[in-house]
A protein has these predicted regions:
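A carboxyl-terminal module marker
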Residues: 678, 682-705, 709, 745-755
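Inter-lobe coupling/hinge segments of SF2-like helicase ATPases
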Residues: 209-215, 219, 232-670, 682, ...
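A general secondary-structure signal for short beta-strands and their flanking turns/coil
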Residues: 3-5, 18, 47, 438, ...
Length: 755
């Protein structure tokens, strides 16, 4: 006699128990359990109910069945099953990031689509984490009987449904009650079914398609990309265009052609702040078969959008990093806009890079993957130069508009002249000029808060978070010190030193402080501050950007969320403040990040008929990175950067992997990192064909976070299957070590040098 078995990965299993377990499928579940099914299983001592995902199903002779075989408790409905494509992405994440099976599962499906264990009438069952919001859909199924004579409401209902199914809500709006409809169902005139309640997130955006008129250069870019879009094989390309060159209209034309081919499109953006403008362009051009996926949606909205995609009711999906897992079928085009942004990398398990997942999906779907940026990653441009990606260029601004002129303001001279403010005299003057002319300005300061450091004037003690090794930041509206890493709050604001009783002086500046200065310097100016603090409310990004577009504000002051992708025709002045701290930041990408940030924000100016200009405040105006960014000279920067990367052995000439160690005792964490490094070296010595350099152990940039000490090993390697197998061997050997205190191990395969 044969048994039907499921191989399942169990939720909440730690890394040592994260493997596939065999379970018997009972007869009552035989037709409901398949690869990708979410199931409820007994696990461990006491057979505690746990969620699991099925990876494989097969038959085995009863005599060959594993001893102690347990039986599945329950299985989720079919619509909760992971498609084969999503299941393949789960396997990909598990293999590439060393996460657990269920960490990968939770990455590819939204919270609302997940289930939890419950007990009903003494039985272990699965319950949805969200109450499903449904509505009744009525469909015409037959003719009205002549007798008894139908009433006017019944006739109206049948007439309304002649053109297709309608919901109870839609019919109620024209005066047809639920009682009338249910009466017609009983007569067999209508059929009724429950469907997910529709939420039109874009109802306020009209469908107003305009001709997609391309410039000759844009048309050439489209023509160059078209053969790979129409080819039924996977392809990848880089669209490198200067700021304002009109990359978006090329996107729209490619999406239009994708839909004509009967396929679907996925558009990724790095920031939630960029989704409103992209959604507006897509909805107005292509209509309502559009879905969105990002973290600003509540759980219900995200689930309904996900189900809309899953059920094939969306042709285009736009969203941030997590949208790369959208369950689109027949995917023909993936666009990754502003592909250089670090936000495409996840900072929690599974620590994936959306670039890698997008490449995997393009191969799985035989799709075109298009990276796009004015300042692409050095690795991406190198791949294009090397012929691994198709390189398509847009070298001119749309409409022949010039790039903004750029000047530097030497803040050393400002200080010497007696200006104590963070806003220079010239920047204030030019902001006033814009106000007088009815034009708008954007100011970038990538530092939130009011004051960034509190220090004792007597002993020099710096006020730091007790849970983290970072200074606390003064936030004036709350009159409190906040940790931007763990959220620790100190209130009321300390005025005396906890070490010696001396006076605390607050210095440094953030967006709140500059907002206050601008109000003092420019009375009557309407200033909109856009940072993590001011955009915490739902729909805040969309609301603020719409207000600025309507010229309800004169100055947009913000962090990096205002630096890229935004297009406002009245913005003619861009100011950059506080860039020096980023220029001398840690990590091998510091120069690349600064070049990109300045190039992008400068490109926000002069995008319509009015010419643009930019002012960069710095104490190092002659720095070559700033000079190249001011000139919008990406190729010049790339030549310098690729030379540095080659000489120093940084990506793309190697992979850069960080192994992090986290624990309660600093000494124990250091010893754990040291021992892991020794074990890795020993195993690597037996495999001389695997290139590897081990650096460290060393403290991470933030040595303590959430009361945990943090050390790291940095590995320069070739991240292939052989290297990952070596890491697995080392992890197994480390787990077998008898250390007095072990540290948690975290791996990041996409690091710039820290976690």
């Amino acid at each position: 006699m044969s048994l039907l078995l499921a191989q399942a990965a169990v939720n909440d299993a730690n890394i040592h128990f994260d493997k596939l377990y065999s379970y018997r499928i009972p007869a009552e579940l035989a037709g409901r359990v398949f690869p990708g099914s979410m199931v409820l299983v007994p696990f461990g001592r006491g057979s505690k109910a746990r969620m699991a995902v099925v990876l494989a199903v097969g038959e085995v002779d009863e005599s060959d069945a594993p001893k102690g075989l347990k039986t599945l408790y329950d299985a989720a409905p079919e619509d909760a099953r992971l498609t084969p494509d999503l299941l393949e992405l789960v396997r990909f994440l598990k293999e590439r990031t060393f996460c657990t099976w269920f960490e990968a599962v939770k990455a590819v499906i939204p919270y609302g689509a997940q289930y939890r264990p419950a007990v009903v009438d003494g039985r272990h069952v699965m319950q949805s984490r969200l109450t499903r919001s449904t509505e009744r859909l009525y469909t015409l199924a037959g003719a009205l009987p002549e007798k008894p004579k139908p009433g006017p409401r019944q006739l109206a209902a049948v007439a309304a449904l002649q053109n297709g199914p309608l919901t109870a809500r839609q019919l109620d709006e024209v005066g047809i009650s639920r009682a009338t409809l249910d009466g017609l169902v009983k007569k067999g005139v209508l059929t009724a079914a429950e469907q997910d309640k529709a939420i039109d997130l874009f109802a306020a955006i009209p469908f107003d398609p305009q001709p997609l008129e391309l410039s000759p250069e844009q048309q050439q870019a489209f023509n160059d990309l078209l053969p790979n879009l129409e080819d039924a094989r996977p392809h990848a390309a880089l669209l490198h265009g200067v700021t304002g060159s009109g990359k978006t209209i090329v996107f729209l034309r490619l999406i239009q052609r994708t839909l004509e081919l009967g396929r679907r499109a996925l558009v990724l953006v790095p920031e939630i702040s960029l989704t409103p403008q992209m959604i507006r362009r897509l909805k107005s051009t292509f209509g309502s078969r559009l879905a969105v996926q990002h973290s600003a949606l509540n759980n219900t909205e995200r689930l309904l959008q996900w189900r809309m995609i899953q059920q094939g009711n969306a042709d285009i999906v736009v969203g941030t990093r997590s949208a790369v897992f959208a369950p689109l079928q027949n995917l023909g085009l993936i666009i990754m806009d502003e592909e250089q942004e670090h936000t495409y990398q996840s900072e929690s398990a599974p620590r994936f890079d959306a670039h890698d997942v997008a490449k995997k999906r393009a191969v799985m779907e035989n799709a075109l993957l298009l990276f796009a940026s004015a300042t692409p990653l050095t690795e991406t441009y190198h791949a294009a130069e090397s012929g691994k990606l198709q390189l398509v260029q847009l070298t001119h601004r749309y409409g022949g508009r010039p790039l903004p002129s750029v000047d530097f303001i030497d803040m050393r001279a400002e200080l010497a002249a007696g200006n104590p403010r963070e806003v220079s005299v010239r920047l204030a003057r030019e902001l006033q000029e814009n106000l007088d002319n009815g034009e708008q300005s954007i100011l970038l300061l990538n530092r939130r808060g009011y004051r960034t450091i509190g220090m004792c004037t007597t002993c020099g003690h710096v006020l730091k978070c007790p849970n983290c090794s970072v200074p606390l930041v003064y936030h004036k509206p709350q009159q409190a010190l906040l940790s931007h890493h763990c959220g620790h709050t100190v209130h009321p604001l300390p005025q005396t030193c906890p070490e010696c009783g001396g006076k605390i002086s607050y210095s440094g500046f953030g967006t709140q402080r500059v907002e206050e200065e601008l109000a003092e310097l420019l009375p009557g100016a309407r200033i909109l501050r856009m940072d993590q603090d001011s955009t915490s409310r739902k729909d805040a990004h969309e609301t603020m950007l719409a207000q600025f577009a309507r010229h309800e504000y004169d100055i947009l002051l913000g962090t990096q969320m205002v630096a890229k992708g935004l297009d406002f025709e009245k913005v003619t002045l861009v100011g950059v403040l506080g860039i020096d701290s980023l220029l001398f930041g840690q990590g091998f990408r510091a120069y690349e990040s600064v070049f990109s940030l300045i190039t992008q924000v400068v490109g926000r100016g002069g995008r319509a008929a009015l010419p643009g200009r930019a002012l960069i405040q710095t104490s190092v105006p002659d720095h070559p990175v700033l000079q190249l960014a001011a000139a919008q000279d990406y190729k010049g920067f790339y030549r310098e950067e690729i030379t540095f990367r080659r000489f120093s052995l940084y990506p793309p000439f190697c992979s850069f992997v960080v192994v992090g160690f986290i624990g309660d005792q600093e000494g124990a964490v250091f010893i754990a990192a040291q021992r892991f490094g020794a074990l890795l070296g020993q195993h690597a010595a037996q495999k001389p064909n695997i290139p590897l350099r081990i650096l460290g152990p060393a403290p991470m940039n933030i040595t303590m976070l959430n009361n945990k000490f943090r050390y790291k090993l940095t590995l320069k390697c070739r991240n292939d299957a052989a290297f990952r197998a070596l890491l697995h061997e080392t992890l197994d050997a480390y787990d077998a070590e008898k250390l007095p205190q072990k540290a948690s191990v975290i791996l990041d395969f996409n690091s710039d040098g820290d976690l």
